[in-house]
Amino acid sequence: MDELRDYKPVQPQGGGPSVRKIIERIGALALVIGTTALKWGFVFVKFFAFFVSIAAYKLWFGSWTFALGFVLLILVHELGHAVEARRQGLHVSAPTFIPFFGAFVTIRHAGLSPWRSALISLAGPLAGGLAALACWIVGESRDSSMLIVRANLGFLLNAFNLLPIGFLDGGSVARAIGESWRMPVIRFEGGVPMQALAPDRTRALVIAALYIGLAGLLVAGMLATKGTGAL
């Protein structure tokens, strides 16, 4: 009896995972798979939309080569926005193409100063204008009317984007000019805002000068390459 009194049953050690643990692991794995699939799904859609845009512009222009070149001009324009935004430390999405409506990039930010916003907006037409200029130079050197017409459309596309209309780059620049013109200068003491002073309108004038200068160059390029041949 004494032996039975001292007997202690052996407890199972290191049993398998509980049902709850298994469910948690399955859920975590499903979340990783779902997130990855969603991410690559967006990448596929953007990649597919690029080629759909080429096909759409082929119907418009009647030439695969010209359609590809035109879409590449749009791509360079959007990359101009993206590069400047990245230079400012912002997160930028890959360009999303919409046939016959161009393309766009999404920029995540918690509010930008008018100066930073204007630089991002102007960077697209600047990059697109440089791409059109490259087409023009190569077209002249090779006597290629197709490249010169492509340059003309590139200048036109980027000049159009600088119209001071809300959803275009020019609309963003116009808003930046207005905000810079009205925005008061805040005087700080010890890191604490103490007084609102009269606006410093130098930045507004600089933005306006950059805007007018770039628009003028694009229009000049468009006029210089007008009526140079067929597709």
Segments and roles (model prediction):
Residues M1-L231:
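Hydrophobic transmembrane alpha-helices and their immediate loop junctions
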